[in-house]
Amino acid sequence: AQELLEQIKLEKQKLIKEGKLKKSALSDSVIFKGDDNKYYEQIGKKCLDITEQIPFEIPVNWAWARMGQIGDWGAGSTPQRGNANYYNGNILWLKTGELNNGIIYDTEEKITQKAFQDCSLRMNKIGDVLIAMYGATIGKLAIVGEDLTTNQACCGCTPYLIYNWYLFYFLMASRDSFIKKGEGGAQPNISRVKLVEHLIPLPPLKEQHRIVAQIEKLFEQLR
C-alpha cells in the first residue's frame, strides 16, 4: 500500500503539471509505525505521535493515510433561488436528500451553464463518491452515475488510483464516527476539513477489489 501512496503522489504531480490540481495538494503526510510500536505522522520536518488516533491495527502490507491524500474533495453550492437564469437548464444539480447510498443517474433539479459559471460549482464526474455533510442526512452516500453538481451540504471526492467502491464502503462503515465528529452545533456538521483529515486504512489495490467483492456478496445474501 505504501507503493500505492507513491503512485498517488506521482499521479498528483502529473495533475498539477496539467493544471488540474493546486500545488498544495502535494503537501501530504506520511504515517508509519516506529520501532517502539507507536504510530507517527511525518508532515514536512515535523514528526508527531498519532498513536491515540489510530483506531485499529492493520496488516503489514496496508498503510494508514488521511482521506485528503487519496482523492480531490470539494463541496458544491446553491445558485440564488430568485434568479430565473440559474434554473431549468440541463446540468444535473443534486441536493443531499437525494443521496441514495447507491448510484445517482438523475436529479430533481437542473441548473444552467450560467449558474455553473457564476456560482463556483464543482462538476463531479462519473465514478466520484458523494457524502452528505450536514443535518439528518449526514454520512449518506452515492456514486456519481452521470456528471453532476451538488449543493453546499454535499462533498464530492474524485479518488486518485484507489477503488471508488472501497472508499464508498469505508465511508458507509464510518458513518457513526462522522455523526460523532459532527456533534456540538445546532445540527451535525462534518465539514470538508474534517473529512480530509479522517484516517483511512489503505490496502493494496487488488485487495480493495477483493474486499468490495466480499462485501457485495454478503449484501446479496442479506437481500
Kindly give the residue locations of the regions a language model identified.
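Non-catalytic DNA-recognition/assembly elements of restriction-modification systems
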Residues: E3-E6, L10, K14-L15, L48-S77, ...
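Extended, domain-scale alpha-helical bundle/helix-rich regions
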Residues: A1-C47
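Sequence-specific dsDNA recognition surfaces
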Residues: K45-Q53, G68-N83, G97-I126, V144-G145, ...
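Specificity-determining recognition surfaces
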Residues: A173-H198
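Short amphipathic alpha-helical segments
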Residues: E52-I54, A153-C155, K194-H198
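A short beta-sheet element
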Residues: K95-T96, D106-M172, G184, S191
